[in-house]
Amino acid sequence: MRICSIGECMIELSNVEHNIFRQSFAGDTANSAIYLSRLGAKSSYITSVGKDFLSKKMLNFLNEEKVQTHNIFQSKDKTLGLYLIQNNKKGERSFFYWRSNSAAKTLLENVNSKNLFNQI
């Protein structure tokens, strides 16, 4: 089975202890691509990232999960979106997003969609 996911994988910061945060990568579409790969599907991901250290780290993360990244575009002047998860005393989560400079927000503006979908 061959499946392609399109979306945004972001930098995730979650509070581990008081003022200590764990950094990972997540996003609904990226998580789906990873889980499908783990189940044995030929999974690929389409998004746009920057050329910075964390963008490269995210690409490595997806490759380690055996998600194909050949249709991930790199922006010269944009980077990854970021979100923070905060738990209140009852354990309920709140999310805070920083996406104004996200490369994925402009993915379809900078890509020939017809050519891309023909490649898939």
Question: Where are the model-predicted features located?
Answer:
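Glycine-rich phosphate/adenosyl-contacting loop at the front of the ribokinase-like
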Residues: 1-68, 107-109
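Conserved N-terminal subdomain of the carbohydrate kinase-like
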Residues: 46-120
